[in-house]
Amino acid sequence: MARIAGVDLPREKRVEVGLTYIYGIGLPTAQKILARTGVNPETRIRDLSEEEVNRLREVIDKEIKVEGDLRREVSLNIKRLMEIGCYRGLRHRRGLPVRGQRTKTNARTRKGPIKTVGAKRKK
């Protein structure tokens, strides 16, 4: 099992798909990495040579922000928005949708389970 950026990549997957298991690398980024390193995207991870794995590791470490660093940057960005008191920061603080979605109905993912208030009782 190849280990890149602290993530064990699944042996049976194609390299192109396997790289997407790393937080911060999607399919387009994975394709760019493979083009830059000269690794065939159709190759299975189990079939990669040690040299190919090292080339992938080198490009990812030097040029792309992934895993812990990226998570830290995102959380610091959100914290900064909350500190400066902008609209997006207030929405984050209140646990509401940030990007203009409706909240009269829906938005349950962000707001959490329904809190029923004043339900009528049967007499």
From Swiss-Prot:
Transmembrane segments: none annotated. PROSITE patterns: RIBOSOMAL_S13_1, RIBOSOMAL_S13_2. The keyword ATP-binding does not apply. One of its GO terms (biological process) is translation. Pfam families: Ribosomal_S13. Keywords: Ribonucleoprotein, Ribosomal protein, RNA-binding, rRNA-binding, tRNA-binding. InterPro entries: Rbsml_uS13_C, Ribosomal_uS13, Ribosomal_uS13-like_H2TH, Ribosomal_uS13_bac-type, Ribosomal_uS13_CS. Located at the top of the head of the 30S subunit, it contacts several helices of the 16S rRNA. In the 70S ribosome it contacts the 23S rRNA (bridge B1a) and protein L5 of the 50S subunit (bridge B1b), connecting the 2 subunits; these bridges are implicated in subunit movement. Contacts the tRNAs in the A and P-sites. This is Small ribosomal subunit protein uS13. The gene is rpsM.
